[in-house]
Design a protein with these regions (language model features):
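Generic structural signal for secondary-structure transition and capping sites
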Residues: 46-50, 79-81, 124-128, 150, ...
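Active-site-proximal loop and beta-strand segments within enzyme catalytic domains
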Residues: 1-93, 107-109, 133-158
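Catalytic loop of the DD-peptidase/beta-lactamase superfamily, centered on the K-T-G motif
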Residues: 104-116, 121, 153-393
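Short, well-ordered surface patches within globular domains
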Residues: 19, 38-39, 112, 116-120, ...
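Short amphipathic alpha-helical face segments that pack within enzyme cores
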Residues: 1-6, 97-101, 173, 178
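Short, mixed-charge aromatic SLiMs
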Residues: 27-35, 68, 119-130, 200-206
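Loop/turn elements at helix/coil->beta-strand transitions in domains of secreted/extracellular proteins
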Residues: 36-39, 126, 242-245
């Protein structure tokens, strides 16, 4: 929401428009079938592939430093979108990273500077900053923890990722409440109405979210909120519009459910205003998708898939070989991973990105040339599908 507020402020100052084609500000991006407008990006309807998936697929775990320039370079190579802009809504970390660069080019200031000058300093948010320097010491920074099994709790030491946009805000619950008062208090800013206007798809269908904010309802009360999730930490800032109560939660436990904690606080302090609890007050997790069953293949059958393949979209080489009767792939310099056959020319594998995404599940389908030999394959993971690889040897 800080990125959305920054964009809204620049819009009000006439320095940009949400109707702008993003290529006005980021000409490095491809010209897709339909232009991506800043409106699409701020409302998560751009269709841009998620860089948090693309980098692990390229053999770049987030334990390695990633810069905004590298993210822009990665996105400039993407030949396709997940969907046409404005047709669907899907949360996009990429869009907000690129919006940070739009802010920099429109204002002449990096996002961290802009936020400090326009928001943090004037509002007395002295404990808040956009983390843009991995060597910077942050006084009183809480250590994050993640759990690896029931009894294995570990500290999280990944501070190489220092590119603000979709995250990297260090703050306190007190400062979050100062921000909430700024947005919703009696002296609310001129951008207040724009920030809280519900977005729509291109066909006019409402999205249930405004600019960097979710619009919802809990037990009869209208809510405005956004959650945060990063290495060993979870957070939420939620406002109950009536009776005008804000709840800020910050956890240094990577498995904490900050949203559920906010609801528990509301249950206690707003009991008189809430309607009786029902069965569908909170979103339920979707059931885990079942993995396709393995299909046995002989050594000779697996051998036809061996070799090196290159993707210009990922700027990465995948090298396949057969080891002990199993097909394995080495992505750049990473350790070999088993690739499990699940059908005709179709395989699946998993890779680890412990710094952020955990386990990334991927699938691929090999493509054959006119003579029947394997010529390449299409790689996919989650919403990111159709990433092309061509045989090198």
């Amino acid at each position: 929401q800080f990125v959305a507020a920054s964009i809204s402020m620049l819009e009000r100052e006439g320095k940009l428009s949400l109707d702008d084609d993003v290529r006005r500000w980021l000409p490095e991006l491809p010209a897709y079938e339909r232009p991506i407008r800043l409106y699409h990006m701020i409302h998560h309807t751009s269709g841009l592939r998620d860089y948090l998936t693309l980098f692990p697929l390229a053999g770049r775990d987030h334990y390695f430093p990633i810069s905004l320039v590298q993210i822009l370079d990665m996105m400039s190579r993407q030949r396709a979108l997940v969907f046409l802009p404005g047709e669907r809504s899907e949360y996009s970390n990429t869009a907000y990273m690129l919006l940070a660069l739009v802010i920099e080019r429109a204002s002449g200031q990096p996002l961290a500077e802009f936020a400090e000058e326009r928001f943090f300093a004037p509002l007395g948010m002295d404990a808040s900053l956009m983390y843009d320097d991995s060597e910077k010491i942050i006084p009183r920074r809480a250590t994050g923890y993640d759990r690896h099994g029931d009894d294995d709790i570990r500290m999280v030491h990944n501070f190489n990722f220092d590119v603000p946009g979709d995250g990297q805000l260090y703050t306190t619950v007190e400062d979050l409440l100062r921000w909430d008062h700024y947005l919703h208090g009696p002296d609310r800013p001129a951008i207040h109405a724009a920030m809280l206007t519900e977005g729509t798809l291109d066909n006019g269908e409402p999205l249930g979210r405004a600019r960097g904010l979710y619009l919802g309802e809990y037990r009869g009360l209208q809510t405005i909120h956004h959650t945060g999730s990063s290495w060993g930490s979870r957070s939420v800032l939620m406002r109950f519009v009536q009776p005008g109560v804000a709840i800020a939660i910050a956890c240094n436990d990577g498995l904490a459910d900050a949203l559920a904690l906010a609801y528990r606080v509301a249950d206690h302090f707003l009991a008189a205003e809430l309607t009786p609890a029902g069965g569908n007050d909170r979103e339920e997790d979707s059931p885990a998708e079942e993995l396709p069953a393995p299909v046995p293949l002989t050594h000779q059958q697996l051998a036809q898939f061996t070799g090196a393949f290159f993707s210009s979209e990922l700027d990465a080489i995948y090298r396949f070989g057969v080891v002990d009767g199993r097909l394995v792939v080495r992505i750049e310099q990473e350790a070999p991973l088993e690739v499990i056959p699940i059908g005709d020319d179709r395989f699946r594998f998993s890779l680890s990105d412990q710094a952020y995404s955990g386990v990334v599940a991927a699938s691929l389908e090999f493509r054959r040339g006119s003579g029947g030999a394997v010529a390449g394959f299409e790689l996919g993971s989650g919403s990111e599908q159709g990433i092309a690889f061509e045989r090198l040897q």
